[in-house]
């Protein structure tokens, strides 16, 4: 299985990568830190899953120029271009943005779900593994 993580926070990306590596066998994981490089890599290579942060810098060399709705734009761009599935994994407070993420899941067939990332909790780990394994 091949997975691409598009995440600008290196600690969060490593946390997600570690979680997947410990729970999924025969997995290859790549990480991109910016919207532009992530989308290009997703087009160029064949991934089973793409895990997307909602807010990403447009370019890796300018981490301050942020695209606040990166997940929606990536889903729109990849909807017809990839056979892979996408998961939104973003840090947000309970109740915040859940309607927005639900609409993305409902609106894009490649999006199988969203996960509220919180490094102090374990629930996100279980959710992301369930989504990857298809037992949500």
Q: Model-derived features: where do they sit?
A:
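Hydrophobic/aromatic residues positioned on beta-strands within the core alpha/beta folds
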Residues: 89-90
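C-terminal output helix
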Residues: 96-102, 115-132
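Conserved phosphotransfer microenvironments
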Residues: 51-81, 97
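Acidic, metal-coordinating helix/loop segments flanking the phosphotransfer/catalytic sites
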Residues: 17, 30-49, 56-59
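Amphipathic alpha1 helix at the N-terminus of the CheY-like receiver
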Residues: 11-22
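Helix N-cap/capping motif at the beta->alpha junctions
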Residues: 11, 31-40, 64-71
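Conserved acidic carboxylate
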Residues: 7-8
């Amino acid at each position: 299985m091949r997975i691409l993580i598009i995440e600008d926070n290196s600690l969060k990306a490593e946390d997600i990568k570690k979680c997947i590596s410990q729970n999924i066998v025969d997995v290859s994981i790549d990480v991109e830190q910016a919207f532009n490089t992530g989308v290009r890599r997703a087009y160029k290579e064949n991934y089973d899953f793409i895990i997307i942060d909602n807010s990403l810098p447009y370019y890796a060399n300018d981490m301050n120029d942020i695209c606040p709705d990166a997940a929606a734009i990536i889903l729109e761009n990849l909807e017809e271009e990839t056979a892979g599935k996408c998961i939104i994994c973003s840090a947000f407070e309970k109740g915040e943005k859940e309607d927005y993420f639900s609409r993305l899941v409902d609106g894009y067939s490649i999006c199988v779900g969203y996960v509220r990332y919180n490094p102090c909790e374990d629930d996100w780990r279980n959710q992301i593994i369930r989504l990857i394994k298809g037992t949500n």
